[in-house]
């Protein structure tokens, strides 16, 4: 072994001596036999600029000592073509940018095609041979294969400068501008702060946007890119999952070392996830394929320390990434919502495989909300909701179809007895709404595994207390006022929940007097309202149930719920303590924090509550009515026995002004004029149709633009009374009291006597007689007028001689300015008669009403 080493040393010592001996023996005219790349550069003037830069930067010795390399030397014209000046080039000059180590390139030996030359710690070079022409990084080799004799090297003269290659993120931006199809991966790479650690000296398989969208939807892409810049600030668990997914995807697309151009057949490589990949190139090396994909439309694009190939159909992008609801919520810009779930230990709802439906507010409404655990749970349903499928069986008719669902908030034992709080979804022409307030933005859910996600336009709020849960359009203010007077707006916790049948909408119409009575009688008010509240949860979709519950009095009550046959959206609720069945709209339930409210548009009284005519009259304050009716036994029984009549009751202040007293001779007629049979009461309640009185007089009803109700004698609208309030008895809804602002005067009936009513035949005869008399009078006037004219002519002839030639004419008044100047006083109408039919009566001195009734029976002036 030592002998071999000694022999090699002797050889190295002898080589310079032999070279020197050959030089001494050589003739002076012969070329110098030992040349280096520096010698070649100095011997060729076209390389003078490049040589000067090498000398100036001190690389001559370095190049002389190198072996087994290729140098690409720009000719002088390259420095003129380039954008950089020579000084700028010198400033950034690195000799390694122009070298290939461990390879002596000879262009003449290259076959036609594209070749990728690796270089340690430098960007690879792309060589392309076409016929006799060769290019390096698309720069023409104009002086090929210049070989020094004293170095194992080659020099290739090129006509342009080899520029520094861009970083990978810069290259991807450039490629996206060229193709308009590389935005996603470009953003993906840029989102890594240390992407160079993955891509240096690597082959990067770049999926085009079309490739990404083939395997990832928009939500998943948003998650991978962290489009909303939230994941970096999320909880540590979410951050770790996100970082692992992104790293896995990036490593799936990176192969250590540089591969491109013409590749060996059956080339099997591994990516950074240790997945085996089969890579091949086409015959020219201009495009590559991975795992039998289509050949890359973008190939052999060089970056700082690597090469990029772009693909449209890589099939392994999704291999190492498993999506769940949590990742989808991040992709929907709901990272704050996810953070709250972790904070409340509710992350299981977005991680397990159970069927879950989530209603999540859009991004602008889920930031810094400070959710409570119950409010978060109210956004979840343990089961799948498919709106289009769930509502497909509900035909689009006049009403808005509604479905009721259980939320995941089921822990309110005190308030709801452990039952889950519900919500309802209603479909209208404008879309789907939760509890009538929160619009669902996507009718088709985002689905991942067993989870369905709906986005809503605002944060879903848990039902509040009784008052807050009722929207103004329900018109429940009167019932709420009555509940407030009974301190029933906040019900005690009963571990069961409550069901309230609440009169709303039009239920209190025509019941103003009833309200006044109830407010004045707390016993009656309690009897009504407490019989409408039940200690259990009964929903409108609990069809065909019959159960016994307790009302707020503590009494057991039987309740049945049935769907009305033949109706599309009506439900009947039967309550044993209420006289009539209650009809409600299906799914009209309103949820509050202690149960459910059923708004009803009818006022149904408990069987134990009786409101009579007597009590309603007392509520009006017109006590004189009782005195008047007590004078007539048959009439008084109407009030005391609740007979089927309604009564118009004037206000107490208007009775004295009317002149009606207990001594009035027409008192009975007055009372009968204000009594209305029950069978026509509805006409007055509806203010429609003819209204007959017990007296036989017909009344009319009208409403003004403010819905004020006025009643008058039929055929005479000049005198009318206004209905102030109405209330009906509990036994008979057509037996009511109408409080009016003043009585209907009997004098209004007397005015009818002055109206002449003649039959049609009499009118006809009158016309004939009138025409005959008119013709006769005209004939007489003509005869009389003719005689006067004749006499005047005769007298005119006799006086002509004595008549002056000029005489003053008397002043003649224009009859058009004095149409009544010649009327007799008897023919002129009086002021009273022309102003009003009532004005011809002597005015009544109201100060004397009642003052002249000394010892004698007064006579009513009405």
From Swiss-Prot:
> How does the record classify its membrane topology?
Single-pass type I membrane protein
Q: Which residues are glycosylated?
A: 68, 112, 152, 200, 291, 333, 450, 521, 542, 569, 663, 679, 688
Which PROSITE patterns does the entry mention? Answer: FAS1 (PS50213)
Keyword set, alphabetical order: Glycoprotein, Membrane, Repeat, Signal, Transmembrane, Transmembrane helix, Vacuole
The FAS1 domain extends over 34-162, 463-604, 606-744
GO-annotated cellular components: extracellular space; fungal-type vacuole; fungal-type vacuole membrane; mitochondrion
Mention any additional remark. Answer: Present with 206 molecules/cell in log phase SD medium.
Protein name in UniProt? FAS1 domain-containing protein YLR001C
Organism equals Saccharomyces cerevisiae (strain ATCC 204508 / S288c)
């Amino acid at each position: 072994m030592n002998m071999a080493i000694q022999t090699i040393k002797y050889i190295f010592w002898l080589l310079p001596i032999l070279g020197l001996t050959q030089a001494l023996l050589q003739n002076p005219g012969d070329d110098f036999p030992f040349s280096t790349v520096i010698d070649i550069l100095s011997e060729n003037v076209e390389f003078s600029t490049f040589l000067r830069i090498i000398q100036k930067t001190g690389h001559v010795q370095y190049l002389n000592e190198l072996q087994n390399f290729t140098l690409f030397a720009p000719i002088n014209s390259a420095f003129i073509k380039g954008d950089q000046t020579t000084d700028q080039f010198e400033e950034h000059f690195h000799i390694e940018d122009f070298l290939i180590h461990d390879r002596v390139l000879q262009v003449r030996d290259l076959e036609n095609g594209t070749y990728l030359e690796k270089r340690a710690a430098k960007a690879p070079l792309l060589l392309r041979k076409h016929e006799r022409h060769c290019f390096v990084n698309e720069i023409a080799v104009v002086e090929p294969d210049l070989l020094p004799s004293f170095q194992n090297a080659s020099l290739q003269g090129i006509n342009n400068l080899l520029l520094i290659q861009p970083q990978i993120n810069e290259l991807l931006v450039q490629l996206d501008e060229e193709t308009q199809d590389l935005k996603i991966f470009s953003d993906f790479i840029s989102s890594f702060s240390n992407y160079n650690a993955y891509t240096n000296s690597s082959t990067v398989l770049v999926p085009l946007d079309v490739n990404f969208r083939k395997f990832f939807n928009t939500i998943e892409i948003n998650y991978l890119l962290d489009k909303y810049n939230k994941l970096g600030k999320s909880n540590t668990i979410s951050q770790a999952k996100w970082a692992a997914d992104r790293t896995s995807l990036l490593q799936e697309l990176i192969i250590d070392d540089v591969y491109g151009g013409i590749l060996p057949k059956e080339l099997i490589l591994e990516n950074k996830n240790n997945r085996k990949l089969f890579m091949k190139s086409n015959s020219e090396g201009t495009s590559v394929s991975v795992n039998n994909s289509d050949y890359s439309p973008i190939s052999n694009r060089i970056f700082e320390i690597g090469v990029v190939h772009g693909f449209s159909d890589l099939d392994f992008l999704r291999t190492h990434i498993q999506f769940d609801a949590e990742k989808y919520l991040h992709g929907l810009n709901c990272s704050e919502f996810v953070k709250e779930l972790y904070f409340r230990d509710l992350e299981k709802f977005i991680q397990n495989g159970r069927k879950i439906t989530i209603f999540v507010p859009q991004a602008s409404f889920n930031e810094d909300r400070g959710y409570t655990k119950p409010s978060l749970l109210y956004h979840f349903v343990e089961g799948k909701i498919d709106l289009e499928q769930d509502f497909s069986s509900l035909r689009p008719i006049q009403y808005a179809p509604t479905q009721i669902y259980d939320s995941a908030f089921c822990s309110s034992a005190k308030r709801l007895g452990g039952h889950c709080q519900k919500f309802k979804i209603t479909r209208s022409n404008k879309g789907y709404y939760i509890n009538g307030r929160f619009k669902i933005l996507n009718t088709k859910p985002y689905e991942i595994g067993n989870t369905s996600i709906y986005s809503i336009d605002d944060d879903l709020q848990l039902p509040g207390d009784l008052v807050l849960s009722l929207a103004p359009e329900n018109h429940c203010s009167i019932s709420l006022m009555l509940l407030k007077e009974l301190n029933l707006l906040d019900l005690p916790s009963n571990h069961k929940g409550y069901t309230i049948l609440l009169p709303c909408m039009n239920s209190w119409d025509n019941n103003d007097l009833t309200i006044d009575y109830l407010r004045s009688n707390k016993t009656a008010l309690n009897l009504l309202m407490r019989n409408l509240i039940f200690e259990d949860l009964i929903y409108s979709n609990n069809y065909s149930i019959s159960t016994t519950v307790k009302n707020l009095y503590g009494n057991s009550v039987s309740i049945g719920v049935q769907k009305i046959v033949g109706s599309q959206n009506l439900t009947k609720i039967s309550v044993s303590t209420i006289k009539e069945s209650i009809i409600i709209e299906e799914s009209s339930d309103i949820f509050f924090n202690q149960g459910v409210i059923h708004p009803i548009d009818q006022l149904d009284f408990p069987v134990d509550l009786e409101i009579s005519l007597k009590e309603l009259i007392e509520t009006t304050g017109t006590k004189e009515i009782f005195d008047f009716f007590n004078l007539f036994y048959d009439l008084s029984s109407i009030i005391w026995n609740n007979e089927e009549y309604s009564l118009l009751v004037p206000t107490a202040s208007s009775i004295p002004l009317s002149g009606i007293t207990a001594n009035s001779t027409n008192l009975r007629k007055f009372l009968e004029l204000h009594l209305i049979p029950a069978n026509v009461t509805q006409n007055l309640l509806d203010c429609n149709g003819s209204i007959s009185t017990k007296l036989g007089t017909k009344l009319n009803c009208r409403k003004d633009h403010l819905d004020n109700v006025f009643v008058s004698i039929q055929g005479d609208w000049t005198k009318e009374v206004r209905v102030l309030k109405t209330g009906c008895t509990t036994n008979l809804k057509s037996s009511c009291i109408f409080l009016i602002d003043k009585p209907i005067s009997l004098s209004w009936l007397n005015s009818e006597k002055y109206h002449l009513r003649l039959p049609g035949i009499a009118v006809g005869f009158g016309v004939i007689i009138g025409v005959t008399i008119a013709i006769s009078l005209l004939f007489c006037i003509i005869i009389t007028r003719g005689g006067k004219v004749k006499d005047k002519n005769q007298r005119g002839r006799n006086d002509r001689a004595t008549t002056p030639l000029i005489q003053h004419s008397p002043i003649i008044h224009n009859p058009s300015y004095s149409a009544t100047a010649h009327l007799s006083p008897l023919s002129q109408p009086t002021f009273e008669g022309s102003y009003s039919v009532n004005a011809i009566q002597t005015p009544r001195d109201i100060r004397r009403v009642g003052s002249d009734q000394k010892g004698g029976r007064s006579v009513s002036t009405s």
